[in-house]
Swiss-Prot record:
This is Flap endonuclease 1. The gene is RAD27. Keywords: DNA damage, DNA repair, DNA replication, Endonuclease, Exonuclease, Hydrolase, Magnesium, Metal-binding, Mitochondrion, Nuclease, Nucleus, Phosphoprotein. It holds the Pfam family XPG_N. Mg(2+) 1 binds at residues 34, 87, 159, 161.
């Protein structure tokens, strides 16, 4: 689900935290990708001309495999090395959010069924997309495909976003990539959004600097996590009626959720704290997530198993042999070259002197000269 209103809040208070660029600008980078999130995107966006998901002759959905295969190749062609991180078991606190998602899908199914032969094609597609979920089988299919492609995968013990952030903090990759803004709660040096979007959508990649975001918001990591819980996260409900502006104001004024709760319970406001609100437990999940240590993880990109890809994707899933072979050759070529060094890793950026700086230096020099003459 992410954190409601966080993106807008950071843009308002920390505009310097954002960079926008194209895929090619990530040349030479290693990136940890939230696999479940990108599979969900592919199931929604990779469609036939009639809006239906891609399927093979047996009626099996293949949108997720097509998306993973071609987008990964595009990254490798741009000298980017991706690693896909898969979710493990969800935290107990997330059970409520998962139940809500199930209820929303059931409601969408009822609304879709109610349309029957009525309504527009767009109406039917709208409800169909709300029904999308990534199944365990689709996760396993994606893992098998990535292994055949020679792309490393990591199975997180719990949340994939937390594991992506751990890999970035540990220096194994440059950034964590996910659409979920709550990834920032796990302190990745950089968060990439829209990385797995198709280039045809013409949506630039967003890079958010954690350090710059905290500087602009003027918060430490504990306060930032409390802000995200107050805005609304996957682990617990929030205080009804508190939006982004109010949430930010409350954290700045009181400093922590404990003090906000204390202030509310003294009757100083119209807000009501949810009964048995587990905000402290939610905070702990963000500050001390269950992850594999980056130092214990070895990431290796290997040469693709071309014949294995043909067997799995062509014979097993009904893809075009010519396209799979062509894609495999691009992958082979890209991975063989390795990640080339970036120019910014060899040079230190030096601030340029503008006209004013030169003028100031000249004035200072003249003043010093005059003093010496005296």
């Amino acid at each position: 689900m992410g954190v409601k209103g966080l993106n807008k809040l950071i843009k308002e208070h920390s505009p310097n935290a954002y960079k926008e660029y194209q895929l090619k600008n990530l040349f030479g980078r290693k990136v940890a990708i939230d696999a479940s999130m990108c599979l969900y995107q592919f199931l929604i966006s990779v469609r036939q001309s009639d809006g239906q998901q891609l399927t093979n002759d047996d009626g099996e959905t293949t949108s997720h495999l097509s998306g993973i295969f071609y987008r990964t190749i595009k990254m490798v062609e741009n000298n980017i090395k991706p690693v896909y991180v898969f979710d493990g078991k969800p935290p107990v606190l997330k059970g409520g959010e998962l139940e809500k998602r199930l209820l929303r899908r059931e409601e969408a199914q009822k609304q879709k069924d109610a349309l029957k032969d009525e309504g527009t094609v767009e109406d039917h597609l709208k409800f169909e997309k709300r029904l999308v979920r990534v199944s365990r089988e689709q996760n396993e299919e994606a893992k098998k495909l990535l292994e055949l492609m020679g792309i490393p995968i990591v199975e997180a013990p719990c949340e994939a976003e937390a594991q992506c952030a751990e890999l970035a903090r540990g220096g194994k990759v440059y950034a964590a990539a996910s659409e979920d803004m709550d990834t920032l709660c796990y302190e990745p040096p950089q968060l990439l959004r829209h990385l797995t979007f198709a280039e045809a959508r013409k949506i630039p990649i967003d890079e958010i600097s954690y350090k710059e975001a905290m500087a602009g918001l003027d918060m430490n990591k504990e306060q930032f996590v409390d802000l995200c819980i107050l805005l609304g996260c996957d682990y617990c409900e929030t205080i009804r009626g508190v939006g982004p502006v109010t949430a930010y104001k409350l954290i700045k004024e009181h400093g922590s959720l404990e003090k906000i709760v204390e202030w509310i319970e003294k009757g100083n406001t119209k807000y009501t704290v949810p009964e048995n609100w587990p905000y402290a437990e939610a905070r702990e999940l963000f500050l001390n997530p269950e992850v594999k240590k980056a130092s214990d993880i070895s990431l290796k990109w290997k040469e693709p198993d071309v014949e294995g890809l043909i067997e799995y994707m062509v014979k097993g899933k009904g893809f075009s042999e010519d396209r799979i072979r062509s894609g495999a050759e691009k992958l082979k070529k890209g991975l063989k070259g390795g990640v080339q060094g970036r120019l910014d890793s060899f040079f230190t950026v030096v601030k340029k002197d503008d006209g004013k700086d030169k003028k100031r230096k000249s004035t200072a020099k003249d003043t010093k000269s005059k003093k010496q003459k005296k």
